[in-house]
């Protein structure tokens, strides 16, 4: 089992109610891995520092910023308000339980949340987000609920841009 999935299981056991986004969300939804050094997840409400400390989730100052780690040394980013502008309540309400081994599930953001959040992130920076978008188009295109995805976008223009680019990526894949 992939080490990030093992860590996702441990985080879920430690903290409960977490929804994985980012590289781990993509891995859970598509079974495609890419290099990632951290685990990003959403929770319905702020996790008190005391709880995290009690569970031995520790912080380090890196370049003047507090960075949180699991007891096993994995860097984590915890989202409590939104994921790339998508409200946390929608991220959690649309999350999917993914079975990672017999009778063990971990929650991942829905494909629709991952698509919208990756498109928004890719607009701000170059890199892994483009790869993640291609992976989602290749592996999950046919299962996308376009009506749900539309409710996650901020405008008709954003929805059409995402839809058109996903359509094009899917068609390109069919040619190879």
Language-model regions: role of each:
Residues 1-176:
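Compositionally biased terminal segments of proteins
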């Amino acid at each position: 089992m992939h080490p990030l999935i093992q860590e996702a299981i441990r985080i879920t056991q430690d903290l409960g109610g977490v929804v994985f986004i980012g590289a781990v969300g993509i891995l859970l939804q598509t079974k495609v891995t890419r290099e990632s050094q951290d685990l990003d997840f959403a929770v319905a409400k702020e996790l008190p520092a005391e709880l995290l400390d009690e569970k031995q989730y520790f912080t380090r100052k890196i370049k003047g910023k507090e960075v949180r780690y699991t007891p096993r040394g994995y860097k984590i980013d915890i989202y409590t308000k939104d994921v790339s502008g998508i409200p946390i309540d929608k991220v959690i309400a649309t999350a999917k339980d993914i079975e990672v081994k017999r009778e063990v599930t971990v929650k991942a953001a829905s494909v629709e949340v991952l698509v919208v959040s990756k498109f928004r992130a890719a607009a701000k920076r170059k890199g892994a987000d483009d790869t993640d978008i291609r992976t989602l188009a290749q592996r999950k295109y046919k299962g996308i609920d376009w009506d749900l995805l539309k409710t996650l976008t901020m405008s008709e223009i954003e929805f059409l841009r995402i839809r058109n680019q996903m359509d094009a990526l899917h068609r390109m894949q069919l040619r190879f």
